[in-house]
Amino acid sequence: MNSMHLHAVRYIRVRLQRMRQMAAIQRKERGGPACSRQAPGDRIRFNRRTRCLESEHRAIS
């Protein structure tokens, strides 16, 4: 039961992360800033967990 819950939480986090990543990419394509306003806590969580996202921004730009 507990492991199922952990898996679900991780899955949801990944989904959110992907959605945010897609939004950032679309924003970049429209010519806006790659990472527009994020909550400070958001950016810390982002940087720690998703280095792939930052490297992808570099690859795109």
Curated annotation (Swiss-Prot):
Source species, domain of life: Bacteria
The protein's name in its UniProt record: Uncharacterized protein TP_0825
Gene source species: Treponema pallidum (strain Nichols)
